[in-house]
């Protein structure tokens, strides 16, 4: 499972406050905690006012890259911001994200022409009309973006498709549609990654962590192999290790057992 750590996003009030107050220790501690918990990438999103977003994102990136070896997932809704910070990454990471909206593909895809071939990309199934409400349209958008990405040396196995799962509180068949989208996309591109912002499914519901955890487990079963999530959540990480073992991806449950011995999952052990 590819884990994109979500805890350094300016949309989170405490992170926004840390950015405004230039609290380096807060940013550093959150980066280290996510890296130690097992994040594959650490998402950095300033999410501040447009006029200071670039400056804030550069500041965050500097702190995180000094603190941990985990690659960055550079995150902004503005493709020009991503283009500006792309060369500042000390090692290949993840670009979050491209879509069919505006000029995002025109600005971002050329970055991969001569880039290290281990760079990867998140692609969201939306366009200028917004998020489609049909499975067929999302699969169609995926095909359009992937075929365009291929022109810039991006193979499907370096792309994380986010089918933009809808909140279950507003769409009763949200998970079932997500399942159908995964099946439709993988039929065309068997080795492409499927990702999701786990918390989207539970928007507007009580006990959101419970819904998020069960959504993740079911989604892994139907083929999701990447997620934007909180790696410091013991319950979520425990569910990932357990599900991976149940799906036959963990020989003799070695990873599950190792995670328990390391104190990453299960009850907090007294020292």
Curated annotation (Swiss-Prot):
An example molecular function term from Gene Ontology annotations: methionine synthase activity
GO biological process: methylation; pteridine-containing compound metabolic process
Recorded catalytic activity of this chain's protein: methyl-Co(III)-[quaternary-amine-specific corrinoid protein] + (6S)-5,6,7,8-tetrahydrofolate = Co(I)-[quaternary-amine-specific corrinoid protein] + (6S)-5-methyl-5,6,7,8-tetrahydrofolate + H(+)
Keywords: Methyltransferase, Transferase
Any one annotated GO CC term: cytosol
Residue ranges crossing the lipid bilayer per the database entry: none
Domain Pterin-binding, residue spans: 1-247
Name the record gives this protein: Methylcorrinoid:tetrahydrofolate methyltransferase
Gene of this entry: mtqA
